[in-house]
Amino acid sequence: MGKSAVIFVERATPATLTELKDALSNSILSVRDPWSIDFRTYRCSIKNLPADVSKLMYSITFHHHGRQTVLIKDNSAMVTTAAAADIPPALVFNGSSTGVPESIDTILSSKLSNIWMQRQLIKGDAGETLILDGLTVRLVNLFSSTGFKGLLIELQADEAGEFETKIAGIEGHLAEIRAKEYKTSSDSLGPDTSNEICDLAYQYVRALEL
């Protein structure tokens, strides 16, 4: 089973990405396609919710993971997709679907806007994908409507063995380039279950909670 982690370097500059790539240059085996990510925060407008229920919900769209969108609310996750190819043909045939699905974010911002209000959109476009020995490192600069937010690093390994050591290696390179203030998450959504895309989305939430 694979493992993943997310590192967010808030006190970075847009040039930090290039500096980290240069620090990794001797370990890079190949460079893959660019990637992008959308991270949205929604706030529930319903009043009088129980004190132990958060009003925040997060939407993470992984354009590099089959364009799947994962909703994270408290410790629960839901995986959605807006890809027409993922709709069962039977639903189109019997009229249950038009075959042109709306994204969950479109539904939240239109049909459910009286319940969920988007507070923030953070985007990362044209990120770098670096292949190292047993580790995929994805780097992207994040921006919001207010400007540059920081550097995000997504780590993925096919094998769980020595994954913490690999994370420590990346953190060591961050220290080399004097990027010392960062947040790392390799948490799982649930200790007794494992779903790679849901765990990855949860790690984004844990790392990007601002």
From Swiss-Prot:
Pfam families in UniProt: Med20 (PF08612)
Domain of life: Eukaryota
InterPro entries, per the entry: Med20 (IPR016532), Mediator_Med20 (IPR013921)
Gene3D superfamilies in alphabetical order: 3.30.310.180
Outcome when changing P14H: In SRB2-1; suppresses the phenotypic defects of an RNA polymerase II CTD truncation
Keyword Iron-sulfur annotated: no
Record's keyword terms, sorted: Activator, Nucleus, Transcription, Transcription regulation
GO terms of molecular function: protein domain specific binding; TFIID-class transcription factor complex binding; transcription coactivator activity
Gene Ontology CC terms, in alphabetical order: core mediator complex; mediator complex; nucleus
Claim: Transcription regulation is one of the keywords in the record: yes
One BP term from GO: positive regulation of transcription initiation by RNA polymerase II
Subcellular location: Nucleus
Note: Present with 1720 molecules/cell in log phase SD medium.
Function: Component of the Mediator complex, a coactivator involved in the regulated transcription of nearly all RNA polymerase II-dependent genes. Mediator functions as a bridge to convey information from gene-specific regulatory proteins to the basal RNA polymerase II transcription machinery. The Mediator complex, having a compact conformation in its free form, is recruited to promoters by direct interactions with regulatory proteins and serves for the assembly of a functional preinitiation complex with RNA polymerase II and the general transcription factors.
Family per similarity comment: Belongs to the Mediator complex subunit 20 family.
Subunit structure: Component of the Mediator complex, which is composed of at least 21 subunits that form three structurally distinct submodules. The Mediator head module contains MED6, MED8, MED11, SRB4/MED17, SRB5/MED18, ROX3/MED19, SRB2/MED20 and SRB6/MED22, the middle module contains MED1, MED4, NUT1/MED5, MED7, CSE2/MED9, NUT2/MED10, SRB7/MED21 and SOH1/MED31, and the tail module contains MED2, PGD1/MED3, RGR1/MED14, GAL11/MED15 and SIN4/MED16. The head and the middle modules interact directly with RNA polymerase II, whereas the elongated tail module interacts with gene-specific regulatory proteins.
Protein name: Mediator of RNA polymerase II transcription subunit 20
Organism: Saccharomyces cerevisiae (strain ATCC 204508 / S288c) (Baker's yeast)
Gene: SRB2
